[in-house]
């Protein structure tokens, strides 16, 4: 039987159909190592998020500044090629930030916004309260109400 919409009958003042939606977008930050990329993009893939990887490599001074007040860390929010991350087109359209490792965690925590949660993979080596959900292996030896522990490293090769 044809749906009421196709039969010409109006089913309400604003009928809602299941329209295809674009996949949520994930802005992924971390050092440009194959294992870190694989873990972060593997999580994005399994969550059915469209992920864009942005390599970062903040200095020690930048990581200290990023752990402080927002105004102090703002100049340090740069990708590995020097571009400002706060105005990056992929960040502006993202629904979530995935960070990986300590350096990625420092950048990710600084990019956290009310409408854009941050999900780090691995121990971010800073206060876990700065993150919405953390995904860490048992060997990372962290725990808390916002920590999801897994047995092995994440990747996009096998089902969870």
Segment roles from a protein language model:
Residues 25, 95-96, 117, 133:
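Structural motif
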Residues 78-93:
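Short, well-structured alpha-helical segments in soluble
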Residues 103-104, 141:
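Alpha-helix capping/helix-boundary segments
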Residues 128-160:
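A nucleotide-sugar donor-handling region in carbohydrate enzymes
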């Amino acid at each position: 039987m044809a749906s009421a919409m196709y039969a010409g009958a109006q089913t309400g003042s604003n009928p809602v159909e299941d329209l295809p939606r674009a996949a949520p977008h994930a802005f992924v930050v971390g050092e440009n190592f194959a294992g870190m990329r694989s873990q972060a993009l593997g999580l994005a893939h399994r969550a059915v998020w469209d992920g864009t990887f942005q390599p970062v490599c903040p200095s020690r001074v930048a990581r200290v500044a990023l752990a402080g007040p927002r105004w102090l860390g703002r100049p340090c929010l740069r990708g590995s090629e020097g571009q400002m991350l706060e105005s990056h087109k992929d960040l502006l359209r993202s629904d979530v930030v995935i960070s990986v490792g300590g350096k990625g965690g420092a950048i990710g925590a600084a990019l956290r916004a009310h409408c854009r949660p941050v999900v780090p993979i691995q121990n971010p080596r800073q206060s876990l309260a700065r993150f919405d959900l953390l995904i860490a292996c048992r060997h990372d030896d962290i725990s808390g109400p916002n920590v999801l522990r897994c047995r092995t490293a994440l990747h996009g090769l096998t089902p969870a």
